[in-house]
Regions:
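Alpha-helical scaffold segments
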Residues: 1-117
């Protein structure tokens, strides 16, 4: 039985993702933010994107690192912080801040996730 393996990440892949991240359309930038092979520096740059959809895509990216999630835990938009609250890679210090979040839904989502772990 063969197993599926993801193709190797090439310089070409990274260049295409960088081009997508600069696209004027937020949906295209969000697709770059959600990509599993997007390099960390690209993801961190997208954390500054003005469009909430892009930052939500970052917070939902299964391969997002703890440092990026810690940064997104301070996002001005509550829906981004809610996605950070449910991400399994969110570090403890970010969870502690989210537990004191001004938005009751962020706190509720975090409490629900924490109680189920």
């Amino acid at each position: 039985m063969s197993t599926f393996r993801s193709p190797e990440v090439t310089g070409s892949t990274v260049r295409r993702l960088a081009a997508l991240a600069r696209d004027p359309r937020p949906g295209i930038r969000a697709s770059a933010a959600a990509h599993r092979h997007a390099p960390a520096e690209l993801l961190h740059a997208l954390a500054e994107d003005e469009d909430t959809r892009v930052r939500v895509a970052l917070a939902r990216n299964a391969w997002a690192g703890p440092d990026l999630l810690d940064r997104l835990a301070g996002d001005a938009v509550a829906v981004v912080r809610r996605w950070v609250a449910v991400h399994p890679n969110t570090p403890a210090q970010a969870r502690d801040r989210l537990a004191q979040d001004e938005d009751p839904q962020v706190r509720a989502v975090l409490a629900m996730v924490t109680s189920s772990r």
